[in-house]
Amino acid sequence: MRLAITMGVAITLVLVSPAEALSPALTPELRMSVMDKEQKVEFAIAQLVTDKKQRLCAKRIAYKESRYNETSLNKKSGARGVWQLLWGKPHWSVLKQTQEAHKYVLHRYDTWCEAYRFHQERNWY
């Protein structure tokens, strides 16, 4: 079932069933709209990381940093989002946040598991 409601000029609301949301024909953002916080993070990681062990390391960092909360804000440092990025923007989706975190992790640590090892030692990454 698909229902599109247009309000005014710029807002379009599309409702899809959970089964439709898993269809590869839909954009990742639309598919994520029916997922809970943890599922969104898992889905975003899976778009970028193929290795199961690396995905698990990434997921562990996300949980420790924000409990999968995409709107999390550290008032002391200004870091925000699932990954607590210092350069994160409040309007970024979980997918965008994860893309940015992935670039950072590959640049700084080479792998998510190396980043997680560092995180375990220092409680930041």
Show which residues each predicted segment covers:
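N-terminal prepro-regions of secreted/extracellular proteins
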Residues: M1-D36
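Peptidoglycan cell-wall recognition and remodeling modules
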Residues: K37-Y125
